[in-house]
Amino acid sequence: MSTTKVKRRVGKYELGRTIGEGTFAKVKFARDTETGDPVAIKILDKEKVLKHKMVEQIKREISTMKLIKHPNVVRIYEVMGSKTKIYIVLEYVTGGELFDTIVNHGRMREDEARRYFQQLINAVDYCHSRGVYHRDLKPENLLLDSYGNLKVSDFGLSALSQQIKDDGLLHTTCGTPNYVAPEVLEDQGYDGAMADLWSCGVILFVLLAGYLPFEDSNLMTLYKKISNAEFTFPPWTSFPAKRLLTRILDPNPMTRVTIPEILEDEWFKKGYKRPEFDEKYDTTLDDVYAVFNDSEEHHVTEKKEEPEALNAFELISMSAGLNLGNLFDSEQEFKRETRFTSKCPPKEIVRKIEEAAKPLGFDVQKKNYKLRLEKVKAGRKGNLNVATEILQVAPSLHMVEVRKAKGDTLEFHKFYKNLSRTLKDVVWKSDDLQNQLS
């Protein structure tokens, strides 16, 4: 197994590992070679975007989002294009998903949940006021920065999964219905602002309760519960919080509470401070126009550099501060990705992962020392895909990265726990990693 890895550059950015995948895009960790700063780069396939007939809407929304500098919204720094790809350079957020906190510590205290909800409503309201709707608010789009502040990702990019029909309303097919408004599930066309608000209500419920308001193993029963807003508050929910949630989770979008009304709600207003930030637009949109006009003179340079040795310290650096800790440390915080080290030969690691995944209902696809685990039977929360990669960091030491490629965050955590029980004999305690290499 090689100890080298070919580096790929796009413009001034050096691309690293894949940190997220979707139907239309892949997200990679990258480094600005001029400043050394970490960024995330969302890579879109131009042909798919053109086929989807959403170019104008995506162009408009990306242009708007590039101008937005709200503290609770993930920034778009730059847009680049090549002959076949669109590269969107984004702020890199290091604190994991908001719902990791729920998985690790259970429901939040009311004042803590309120603070995150205030930040969420601020972000949503700001983007709505500029004509951009999210339409796909769910746990993996709610991130935390290193200071514990909420950052909403993928605003302005959700048009990739939408279709506008002759009635002028948005239509979508949803794979994860738990956070989705009744009018979206009915596919009769919907108002993006009111649909976003419903999702915010579901998110607030989870923060306060520690579980979803609408949950059922039968998909049709789940749809019925959502359509009728059939849910029960846990006994510890305060009356003011119940009152607000009941107004948000109103199945009729015409009578559902609006954001201006939420901003005046007594429960919401407690301890509320509107964020202060610089709204001056010193940003150019020339790069966006060049990409979507497909101007060849503005195509970014894509190139692969000579392979160089990859050691554990470079891997730690590439991970931008993410913990290299043992996968099975019971105190370790859950993330959408994790790593462990092993002294086993790579072929044995692959075999053990296969043996662990198949009884859990996963189909395993192998390519060299990369594995893709895909749930054979999609659950009510859609398909769960898990990507793993084995990297050699010393002659007898390997690092294994396990990450969620697609699917529900909470489902990934369940998979992770089951996998950990089977792979314990493969994992080597990483506390000695530095001694091994020194």
UniProtKB/Swiss-Prot annotation:
One of the protein's GO biological processes: signal transduction
Requisite cofactors: Mn(2+)
Region (PPI): 335-364
SUPFAM superfamilies: KA1-like (SSF103243), Protein kinase-like (PK-like) (SSF56112)
Coiled-coil spans in chain: none
Listed CDD domains: CIPK_C, STKc_SnRK3
Active site (UniProt): 136
InterPro entries: KA1/Ssp2_C, Kinase-like_dom_sf, NAF/FISL_domain, NAF_dom, Prot_kinase_dom, Protein_kinase_ATP_BS, Ser/Thr_kinase_AS
UniProt superkingdom: Eukaryota
Function: CIPK serine-threonine protein kinases interact with CBL proteins. Binding of a CBL protein to the regulatory NAF domain of CIPK protein lead to the activation of the kinase in a calcium-dependent manner.
Family according to the record: Belongs to the protein kinase superfamily. CAMK Ser/Thr protein kinase family. SNF1 subfamily.
Protein name (record): CBL-interacting protein kinase 32
Organism, as annotated: Oryza sativa subsp. japonica (Rice)
